[in-house]
Amino acid sequence: MLMITSFANPRVAQAFVDYMATQGVILTIQQHNQSDVWLADESQAERVRAELARFLENPADPRYLAASWQSGHTDSGLHYRRYPFFAALRERAGPVTWVMMIACVVVFIAMQILGDQEVMLWLAWPFDPTLKFEFWRYFTHALMHFSLMHILFNLLWWWYLGGAVEKRLGSGKLIVITLISALLSGYVQQKFSGPWFGGLSGVVYALMGYVWLRGERDPQSGIYLQRGLIIFALIWIVAGWFDLFGMSMANGAHIAGLAVGLAMAFVDSLNARKRK
């Protein structure tokens, strides 16, 4: 048995399972925190993943609803309930995911009230040799964001990727990825631009690299990122490097974070194969 993906909404999971049944592929749903879709015949994995990518691009396509009717039902037998917005957030996010989101929001509010410079004096990467033993600074730069778009973009990806890692691999794994990527991406960025930078994007890029490569090399880990999204991440890095959008980006942190995530995923997937 091979786990293909997970859906927060069981109706969406059932729609995909029904469609694949019309294509001659039998999938099953197991209910845990989310609806996990499993494939018994692993020889069809590539075909199923290709169909999944098309499904995720437009799950509302009429052919998927038609497949449910063709399968003889539109009711999966599962008990559904409508999730309000915050309940949907809570469904995917574990405690570490939530703590980081809250910390970033609190710091952002403090920056609006006190000013960026005042907060950076306390949280920025050590900008003076006398501060090198204030160890929190090697990590707290990731909490600072300088615009509403900046924090929304990073927290959305953090929730999506960090939540998946925490739910599937545990809080400890998410903490390790976060600390290592914050430290190393911060170190590289301060070499590029000095100590005055901030944002969770180095960690987010680490999670992108980790989730994508771990999903490719170890599908049974239960985490997965579409190749199109990792391509988008690479394009964004190139755009930032050549300043195509006229925006100030932490290019060093992005590249270092992505490299950290890929390296950690490679090691973890090797260890997973050795245990089999």
From Swiss-Prot:
Keywords: Cell inner membrane, Cell membrane, Hydrolase, Membrane, Protease, Serine protease, Transmembrane, Transmembrane helix. It is found in: Cell inner membrane. It is a multi-pass membrane protein. It is an enzyme of class 3 (hydrolase). Its EC number is 3.4.21.105. The chain crosses the membrane at residues 94-114, 142-162, 169-189, 192-212, 229-249, 250-270. It catalyses: Cleaves type-1 transmembrane domains using a catalytic dyad composed of serine and histidine that are contributed by different transmembrane domains. The active site is at S201 (nucleophile), H254. GO terms for cellular component: plasma membrane. GO terms for molecular function: serine-type endopeptidase activity. It comes from the Bacteria. InterPro entries: GlpG_N_sf (IPR038236), Peptidase_S54_GlpG_N (IPR022732), Peptidase_S54_rhomboid_dom (IPR022764), Rhomboid-like_sf (IPR035952), Rhomboid_protease_GlpG (IPR023662). One of its GO terms (biological process) is proteolysis. It holds the Pfam family Rhomboid_N. Belongs to the peptidase S54 family. Rhomboid-type serine protease that catalyzes intramembrane proteolysis. This is Rhomboid protease GlpG. It comes from Escherichia coli O7:K1 (strain IAI39 / ExPEC).
